[in-house]
């Protein structure tokens, strides 16, 4: 991602940033202070930082040897995807895993960060409203930006999609311009100016900025600013709506994409097992009870779905959840069958048994100090511990036909969720999840965490999404990109209706903002206790990969930028792109060696 490019960062500053906010495998790119026009790749290796020089010859990018690439983005993508290629002279493998992104240049929601021109066109054309616009990063020139605007004219002729105009925004000396004499202090100032005046294309036609296309992606470390933006009221003809309402309404409209089959829950023999007749599990992700008589229709049914963070790679995510409805009298035995077959060791209950006089969940555990039989299993409640926010029960479960096989299960019941709405502040929920995760991580062979409320979608979805986002940030670092709306869409594709209300949607934002703030403070304390020292790394290439891949040429770039519609003169930076610095290059060719 181009947002790993930090235009104003020195080597010592890069080390401080990577050690203070990154994790092993975090990396960033920055301009070289030694050779103008070159770049440096700074990578955290365990607790240290190594710096790799990147040559920009004017025709290609490389590491003073090895593969050659058309763009800086392609070079970084290659070494990110081809793990094990880079190593220090001492043989230490240098892994590029997690981009440490720079802060967004603006908190405005029309800023989309790292998307390609093609992706921008797809978004704007799907919107279909002429003069809708967004701002994104330039893939071809790190540190610059692109203003993409949907025109009012078809791209190729009648019936074709509307044309999208891409206008490059250069950043020079901390000021922004589309060319010519007009410069601005910020992207926001530039956009606000051209919203009033329009932008004249080379053809003489004007491009207008009338309707922003809002993004939901945000740099995790900047989420507090996004919360402030979303809290702002947007004036309309009849009422003022905040950004949270807009985002949640947009999310609700996309539910039509999740029309997966729910046939098992609709079968007559299973209707009595559903707490709410229309809240049913998707067939493709439902938990199927094992060891049941196939001659008994519906015997393998329970209203529960597997949920996984599909936005993380398989090597980044080891956690699976089961989102379930609260137990009915008729489903308690099935619930314990599910817990046993899945080897679940942690159960999270986010409701009281009765709230406002309404039954939310049948108690499916015995009283403390007692034992009960549930179907094929014996369950003992050996201990209960009360805290200000939740109750922890320590349970033992064993099959009736093998009493010597005993598993311990920790049952966390959150008691501080109000009957309506959400908690007034997220600290209690974050502490609750921290305890749950510590327990789960202490059990290396434990199965999925079962999470339930009453219907198994509202509070359940909120808790799961918060935990997923916390895990992503903990894995990738504070400066990773997160997308709360996209995360909810992803879990809704696995269980219908997850995260039910705008209040729950906003609570996720507020919870993650507090998690980020707390994590920053912890990292500052840790970093203040560590020393810092590093130097430029000397990179070698393992023999097996020295020439295993074809070299990329300038003409083979995957990131072909669109024709930019800028008028006026070229920027000074563009005029310098093709200049050679052969004398400087010769001095640095010794910084890499082949094994």
UniProtKB/Swiss-Prot annotation:
EC code(s) of this entry: 3.1.3.48
Q: Which residues form the active site?
A: 453
* PROSITE patterns linked: SH2, TYR_PHOSPHATASE_1, TYR_PHOSPHATASE_2, TYR_PHOSPHATASE_PTP
Q: In which tissues does this protein get expressed?
A: Expressed predominantly in hematopoietic cells.
Question: Which residue intervals define the domain SH2 in the entry?
Answer: 4-100, 110-213
- Carrying Phosphothreonine, the residues are 394
Q: Where is the cross-link described as Glycyl lysine isopeptide (Lys-Gly) (interchain with G-Cter in ubiquitin)?
A: 308
Q: Report the domain of life of the source organism.
A: Eukaryota
Question: A Gene Ontology MF term for this entry?
Answer: transmembrane receptor protein tyrosine phosphatase activity
Q: What is known of its domains?
A: The N-terminal SH2 domain functions as an auto-inhibitory domain, blocking the catalytic domain in the ligand-free close conformation.
Protein name in the entry? Tyrosine-protein phosphatase non-receptor type 6
Protein's organism: Mus musculus (Mouse)
Give me the gene this protein comes from: Ptpn6
């Amino acid at each position: 991602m181009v947002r790993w490019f930090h235009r104003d960062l020195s080597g010592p500053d890069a080390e401080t940033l990577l050690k203070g906010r990154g994790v092993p495998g975090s990396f960033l790119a920055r301009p070289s202070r030694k050779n103008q026009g070159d770049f440096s790749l700074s990578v955290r290796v365990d607790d240290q930082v190594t710096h790799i020089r990147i040559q920009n010859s004017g025709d290609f990018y490389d590491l003073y040897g090895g593969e050659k690439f058309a763009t800086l983005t392609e070079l970084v993508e290659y070494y990110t995807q081809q793990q094990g290629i880079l190593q220090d002279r001492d043989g230490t493998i240098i892994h590029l895993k997690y981009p440490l992104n720079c802060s967004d240049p603006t908190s405005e929601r029309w800023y989309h960060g790292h998307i390609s021109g093609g992706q921008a066109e797809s978004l704007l054309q799907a919107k279909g409203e002429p003069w809708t616009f967004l701002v994104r990063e330039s893939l071809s020139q790190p540190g610059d930006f692109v203003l993409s605007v949907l025109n009012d004219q078809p791209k190729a002729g009648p019936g074709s999609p509307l044309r999208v105009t891409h206008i490059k925004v250069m950043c020079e000396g901390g000021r922004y311009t589309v060319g010519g004499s007009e410069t601005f202090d910020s992207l926001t100032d530039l956009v606000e100016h051209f919203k009033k005046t329009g932008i004249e294309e080379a053809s003489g036609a004007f491009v207008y900025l009338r309707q922003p296309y809002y993004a939901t992606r945000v740099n995790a470390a900047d989420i507090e600013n996004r919360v402030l933006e979303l809290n702002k009221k947007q004036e309309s003809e009849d009422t003022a709506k905040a950004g949270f309402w807009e985002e949640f309404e947009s999310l609700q409209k996309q539910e039509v994409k999740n029309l997966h089959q729910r046939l098992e829950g609709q079968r007559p023999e299973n209707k009595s097992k559903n707490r709410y007749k229309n809240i049913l599990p998707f067939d493709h992700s439902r938990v199927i009870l094992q060891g049941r008589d196939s001659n008994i229709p519906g015997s393998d049914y329970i209203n529960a779905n597997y949920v996984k963070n599909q936005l993380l790679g398989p090597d980044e995510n080891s956690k699976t959840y089961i989102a379930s409805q609260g137990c009915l009298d008729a489903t308690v035995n099935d619930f314990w069958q599910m817990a046993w077959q899945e080897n679940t060791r942690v159960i999270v209950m986010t409701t009281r048994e009765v709230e406002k006089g309404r039954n939310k969940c049948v108690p499916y555990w015995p009283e403390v100090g007692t034992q009960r039989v549930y179907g094929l299993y014996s369950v003992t409640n050996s201990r209960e511990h009360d805290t200000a926010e939740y109750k922890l029960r320590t349970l033992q479960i064993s099959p009736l036909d093998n009493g010597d096989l005993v598993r311990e299960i920790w049952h966390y019941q959150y008691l501080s969720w109000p009957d309506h709405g959400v908690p007034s502040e997220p600290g209690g929920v974050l502490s609750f999840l921290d305890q749950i995760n510590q327990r789960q991580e202490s059990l290396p062979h434990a199965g999925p965490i079962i999470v339930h409320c009453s219907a198994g979608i509202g509070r359940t979805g909120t808790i799961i999404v918060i935990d997923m986002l916390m895990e992503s940030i903990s894995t990738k670092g504070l400066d990773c990109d997160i997308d709360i709306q996209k995360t909810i869409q992803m879990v809704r594709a696995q269980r219908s209706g997850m995260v039910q209300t705008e209040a729950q949607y906003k609570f996720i934002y507020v919870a993650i903002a507090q998690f980020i703030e707390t994590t920053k403070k912890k990292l500052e304390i840790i970093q203040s206790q560590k020393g810092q020292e590093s130097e430029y790394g000397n990179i070698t290439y393992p023999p097996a990969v020295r020439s295993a891949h074809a070299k990329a040429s300038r003409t083979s770039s995957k990131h072909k930028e669109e024709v930019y519609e800028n008028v006026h003169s070229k920027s000074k930076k563009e005029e310098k792109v093709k200049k050679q610095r052969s004398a400087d290059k010769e001095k640095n060719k010794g910084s890499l060696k082949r094994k």
